[in-house]
Amino acid sequence: MASPNGGDDFESSLLSFEKLDRASPDLWPEQLPGVADFAASCKNPITNSPPKWMAELESEDIEMLKKLGSLTTANLMEKVKGLQNLAYQLGLEESREMTRGKFLNILERPKK
């Protein structure tokens, strides 16, 4: 078994401080546009502060994310299908209400 100090030496020997810039698109073509910019923005992947997208989440939102993360693939697909069906039903209901508003002339601009 390795000693704790030996483990630190081993980990530090694995670190690479080499910078690979994309100065030459011929040598380093960017496979996915924007990935290099994103990687540059993530200078330290291990931070104590939450990411920007989590800053505005409430505890209910985080619980929902945890619940969705614990679902199996089949259950998650079923949840997505249910959300798509709900969105479709809401679209139909909105269409009916807009048609109703058109027939009642409540959506027309007042004539001057």
From Swiss-Prot:
UniProt key word Transferase: no
Tissue: Expressed in the brain, liver and retina. Highly expressed in the retinal ganglion cell and inner nuclear layers at the parr stage. Expressed at a lower level in inner segments of some retinal photoreceptors.
GO terms (BP aspect): regulation of DNA-templated transcription
Keywords: Developmental protein
UniProt keyword Heme present: no
UniProt family annotation: Belongs to the lin-52 family.
Biological role stated in the UniProt entry: May be involved in retinal development.
Subunit structure: Component of the DREAM complex.
Name of the protein in question: Protein lin-52 homolog
Species this chain originates from: Oncorhynchus mykiss (Rainbow trout)
Lineage: Eukaryota, Metazoa, Chordata, Craniata, Vertebrata
